[in-house]
Amino acid sequence: MKIFVKLTRAENTALLGAGPVELDLEEYLCGVVPSEIYESSHMEALKAQAVAARTFAVKRAMAGTVVDDTTSFQAYRAPLAESSPRSRQAVVETAGQVLTYGGEVIDCFYSASNGGTCKRSGEVWSRDYPYYVNKPDPWDTAARTEKSTNPSHGVGLSQVGCMWAAKQGVPYNEILAFYYSGAA
């Protein structure tokens, strides 16, 4: 699958030229994952991020959306695709995996932190999805007691919660199941 990316970052245009450019989805993800979560994160956290990022990208690629390389869509830094072997490994080991609900690719959101509470999408935006459930997030709460992180929109995967859970030995598929209720 291919995805069209409007390049706005100087480091990306220096390598790939002016956008939008057409990129192989899996190669694109190799530049997204280390831009969104620390390369030094536990491998299960990197895998969870890879699946969430792939799901987000596939949903938009299927709709013909041209994404950009900022956090308005997903952060993408082309130079990191080659200098982040652990993120690349996570992308390769989860190749093709996307989250679905009722047989459809979900509209997959994630953020740095949810402040200790997973939010319904309807609490933040105009549309409610059944796989975003309002509930306490013990992983995000535990992570934030170790390091202060400002919460963002709080819908979907919390990156600090994901990293904390992975360090405790939680597999990536269980991390994803917690943040995307009922999605497979």
For every predicted segment, state its role.
Residues M1-A184:
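Conserved, single-site charged/polar hotspot
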